[in-house]
């Protein structure tokens, strides 16, 4: 939560209200209890249990191998650490594409079994019926348009989306369709900033940008990226607020040295 919203439970109505008041929304990914607790404590409004965990936690090359069991496991951990923040869980690849019924059933598991408050799924008009059925069933939904990582093979890599007139128009239409289907928010990833601004102005629901400029109603980053923990690849849109990899290396090197030379444990860290 921000200073204004810190200490109160974040709900879909709070998130919608923040757009109306012009208050920016903060979202970061979280994959475990410890990180979720820290982010919740300092005031992040929304914690996204992203399928990005496949890359930054499990070491895969993409999000595609991530399973429902993976996502449920990590969502449970994050939910236990979130006292006030809203927990949003990604529906992984092939958990919602085959049928509306399967999509709703899998989405419901995140709320029922893992303590999530909402789910996020990628796509536009092709998932509109699933979004509608989820919301009718009482499952809050966050949409995801632009660069949708689960479709990276179709896009031919991680590329900016919506650069041409036709592509931009389709994303704008999809955003409206997802809103009308019942989503309470939508993530816009890797789209030109002017397009994201137009979509933000056109929608009643909040937009959360990642590589979509400052005009969105909120921003999201992968926490491992912004803290400098994940070093395999850093997207252009990531600002590193820390470089914890160096801190971790330094601490572990000192530990190794002290164990090797016998200075750890000393009397202060021993039972006498």
UniProtKB/Swiss-Prot annotation:
Residues that hold Mg(2+) according to the record: 51, 90, 122
Membrane-crossing segments per the record: none
Cell location: Cytoplasm
Assembly with partners or alone: Homodecamer; pentamer of dimers.
Lineage, top ranks: Bacteria, Pseudomonadati, Thermodesulfobacteriota, Syntrophia, Syntrophales
Assigned keywords, A-Z: Cytoplasm, Magnesium, Metal-binding, Pantothenate biosynthesis, Transferase
Official protein name in the record: 3-methyl-2-oxobutanoate hydroxymethyltransferase
Entry's EC annotation: 2.1.2.11
Active-site feature positions: 189 (proton acceptor)
Positions bound to 3-methyl-2-oxobutanoate: 51-52, 90, 120
